[in-house]
């Protein structure tokens, strides 16, 4: 496990720091009441059983006083949006993981927008051990205060800054744990590129079972229905089981030829054993293919996570 961490593998829980609790925050809170956890087991063909804590969407909202006024404005607004307890949520998650699982995986939106303070928080908690997937907010400079390109050119403008805090290949990364290949891909705007597809196929050629780790879930009818109910129909009661027409990221996935073909291929790939994703801020799962279920985890800013055991 030490070697995995040194190589930048999945975050080894045994190497996580012992984090002091803040007695002023819920001083009588119990050890079992800190997190909202879902539990899943994946029969992936591991050479030895292991477990991980999967978290996503922490959404740090910090900015130093000397930073851009727009970032200071975002700090004020977005800290209220997320409740101001994101760092506590991550600290509790990592402390629980250190005692209960082997590894930690984060699937994006660890930060809410780009600021030096946010990137410093990433480094504070993970250093050079972080492994996972990026989210769309990792590339957001000023959120709605400027127009985001949502393409490779836009990401390239700040890729070096992002890379300084996220010590893994931002496009496609792979780490093998007990014979199971965890492959992360950048799909933060819904699409994947031909280069990413080829690199994924190279991972398949290794012949190992694969856990695909993404930020934006891949389109399935049930997950899209759940996302639509939570985000677009807030305040409305359920009236129809009809699957809503694709929009946003999902429209990209069903209309972009490369991405559409990649998803179709994945449904036939027998080495794919599961997909782990976030982005939606809700916990939901659905069978993706004959060999794989897609597990979406709720927002870590609300103390959500899921423990996944592998055999």
Where are the model-predicted features located?
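His/acidic metal-ligating clusters that form di-metal
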Residues: 92-103, 181-183, 190-288
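Acidic/histidine-rich helix-loop elements
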Residues: 56-88, 140-165, 222, 247, ...
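Active-site glycine-centered loops adjacent to acidic/histidine catalytic or metal-binding residues
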Residues: 57, 108-109, 135-136, 215, ...
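N-terminal active-site segment of His-dependent metallophosphoesterases
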Residues: 21-117
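Short active-site segment of divalent metal-dependent hydrolases/proteases
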Residues: 60, 111-112, 138, 218, ...
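N-terminal export signals
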Residues: 1-21
């Amino acid at each position: 496990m030490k070697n995995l961490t040194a190589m930048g593998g999945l975050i080894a829980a045994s190497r996580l720091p012992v984090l002091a609790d803040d007695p002023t925050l819920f001083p009588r809170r119990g050890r079992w009441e800190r997190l909202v956890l879902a539990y899943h087991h994946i029969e992936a063909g591991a050479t030895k059983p292991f477990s991980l804590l999967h978290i996503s969407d922490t959404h740090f909202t910090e900015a130093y006083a000397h930073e851009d006024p727009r970032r200071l404005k975002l700090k004020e607004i977005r800290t209220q949006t997320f409740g101001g307890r994101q760092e506590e949520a991550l600290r509790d998650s990592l402390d629980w993981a250190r005692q209960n699982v082997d590894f930690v995986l984060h699937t994006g939106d660890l930060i809410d927008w780009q600021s030096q303070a946010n990137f410093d928080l990433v480094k504070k908690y993970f250093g050079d051990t972080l492994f996972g997937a990026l989210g769309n907010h990792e590339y957001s400079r000023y959120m709605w205060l400027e127009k985001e390109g949502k393409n490779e050119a836009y990401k390239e403008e700040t890729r070096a800054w992002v890379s300084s805090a996220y010590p893994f290949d931002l496009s496609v990364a792979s780490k093998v744990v007990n014979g199971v290949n965890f492959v992360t891909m950048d799909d933060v705007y819904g699409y994947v590129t031909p280069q990413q597809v080829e690199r994924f196929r190279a991972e398949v050629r290794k012949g190992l079972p694969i856990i695909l780790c993404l930020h934006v879930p891949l389109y399935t009818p049930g997950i899209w229905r759940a996302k639509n109910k939570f985000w677009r129909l807030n305040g409305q009661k359920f009236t129809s089981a009809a699957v809503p027409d694709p929009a946003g990221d999902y429209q990209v996935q069903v209309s972009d030829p490369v991405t559409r073909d990649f998803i179709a291929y994945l449904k036939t790939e027998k080495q794919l054993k599961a997909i782990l994703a976030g982005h939606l801020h809700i916990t939901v799962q659905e069978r993706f293919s004959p060999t794989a279920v897609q597990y979406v985890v709720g927002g870590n800013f609300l103390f959500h996570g899921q423990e996944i055991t592998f055999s």
